[in-house]
Amino acid sequence: MDTAYKTTLELDKVLNRAVQLCACQETKEMMQALEPAPTIEDERYDLTQTNAINALLIKNGSPRFGSVREVRRIVAHARKGGILSMGELLEIAATLRNFSGLSQWYGLSEHEMLPTDDLFFALAPQPVLEKQISESILSPEEMADTASVTLHDLRRKIRQTEDSIRTKLDNIIRNSTTNKFLQDAVVSLRNGRYVVPVRAEYRGEVGGVIHDVSSTGATVFVEPTAVVEANARIMQLRAQEQEEITRILTSFSTQVGSLEPQFTYSYDAMLKIDLLLAKARLAVEQNAFMPAVSDAVHFKLNKARHPLIDKKKVVPVDIELGSEYDTLVITGPNTGGKTVSLKTAGLLNAMAQYGFLIPAHESSIVCHFDEYLVDIGDEQSIEQSLSTFSGHMKRISGILDLAGHATLTLLDELGAGTDPAEGAALAVSILEQLRRQGSLLMATTHYAELKVYALETPGVVNASCEFNVETLMPTYKLSVGVPGKSNAFLISAKLGIPQEIINAARNHMSNDDKRLDSVLSQLESYKLTCDAADVEVVDSDKPGGTIVWQSPASGETVPEWTTIKFRVSAGLASSALPITVDIPQNGKDIVKVEIYVGDEPNPQYS
């Protein structure tokens, strides 16, 4: 699979966020190297695993689970007879603590068999060994006195001997006869032995062994004769202490080494669980759900939200391809959400293929694609010093080489960057060829020719991103079945362009363009009016007439989802007529209106 889509669709940003939610460094690397599920069955299995962990995360909260370093090498070293350091044993204890924490978390609530059972059953906690290591080793440099009876006894003797030495040295320091020979009234350590600082010129006045000289030569560090024997005793005790520490480390290392096969199996399971936990945490952040995976080349995203847009600002969209139509041509104003719709469709399908739940309604269905073929933006043309048009054509040439059954092709501003007539003709030809090759298609455009092509071609449907001409702001709502307008005249008039210029511009339009613009204006007007009343209305084929649907008698309510069906002639584009729907004033009931075009058995608009 071509992986360029990961950057273009911003899947890399989703993965980077998931990396931040991983606890272990190894899991972070696994997430960065994540590959899409190779088959539909694999995708379904991955999604059910993520969904199971997500449900437990919501129900039980986060497990007791901390970051650990890679320890399989440490265990293998112990298996071969190596002695582990205190720091390495603490890493082992932390890993064992993770095993215990995950096992306890999984068992907090009763549940039926889950697809993650094998992972959690693979965990083999060692609570006794974990506790012994944790209580015996205080830090990578310090072992607790209580690590063994022998160690406790040796350290007690060391402390007693040290106290005896300090008492004798304090007497020397306080003695008026000897303290005048000292540089400072302090006791220090040199070569593991307690000494006092003597002025160099009085070195013969304080009997004992010289162990060091200061850098200036003004001070010599003398071990007084009175403490030589006690210092030697301490050296002996410290050697015994180190031997006991080594014995304890050897014992722990042997126990760890004996666990190697089971430990490695548990460790691998822990990393996979950490990966799933990161995916589940991301799902909680995004309010995501598990979609179904279609057996056919078809997807249906309901109330889909782009995961990288602020949840307070993102507008959910409904996008479907592969059932009644295989190609969606999206039109509308710039910055109106056309490109976001493309990216949302591609990104959410791709996320599911990587085992992520998607920010869409749980009734959504995704498709398992072999390729995501994307031409969005001008990154490549900028890098290679190509014109915008040349950059697009270079990418589309590569797309044509790969497009086929079970591929999703997303084309932004198809045919842009060249002569409009040639660009539109080329865009239609590209769409037709990609359809012949069997790819599902979504394309954005400003060309009226593509809107007409979508109206006239079975399997191709218009969609538009709505624009509020009063506020001059896009609503970001995607309306499938209705082509969009550029709104150039309305926007220009709102911004102060004289009306005579607008009128002159209209006269320069061809008759066909005028008719299409009129149809689009009426459809858009109906749509905006209907949205305000929570009802959808479109044209009837009654020549020159107005269809009026009267509400039930006063005091009655409209049954929920009452459906009114209109059938319009195939020549709708040449004769758009108004419709009036009388909405009951006593409630907020919804009326569903279905519009059938020509002899089509399914509604074109609903």
Question: Where on the chain are the PLM-derived regions?
Answer:
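Conserved amphipathic alpha-helical "coupling/scaffold" segments
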Residues: M1-T150, L154, L259-Q262, S266-A280
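Extended, Lys/Glu-rich alpha-helical coiled-coil stalks
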Residues: I58-G66, M86-L89, T246, S253-G257, ...
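Extended, charged coiled-coil "arm/hinge" scaffolds of SMC/Rad50-like chromosome-maintenance ATPases
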Residues: P125-S139, E229-T250
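Extended, Lys/Arg-enriched charged tracts that mediate electrostatic binding to polyanionic substrates
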Residues: D153-R203
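Long, charged, glycine-rich C-terminal linkers/tails
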Residues: I173-R190, A280-K303, H361
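SMC-family hinge/dimerization module
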Residues: R190-F221, N231, V293-P316
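ATPase nucleotide-binding head domains, primarily ABC-like/P-loop NTPase cores
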Residues: Q286-N287, S294-Y526
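Ligand-recognition elements built from short beta-strands and adjacent flexible loops
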Residues: S521, S525, C530-S606
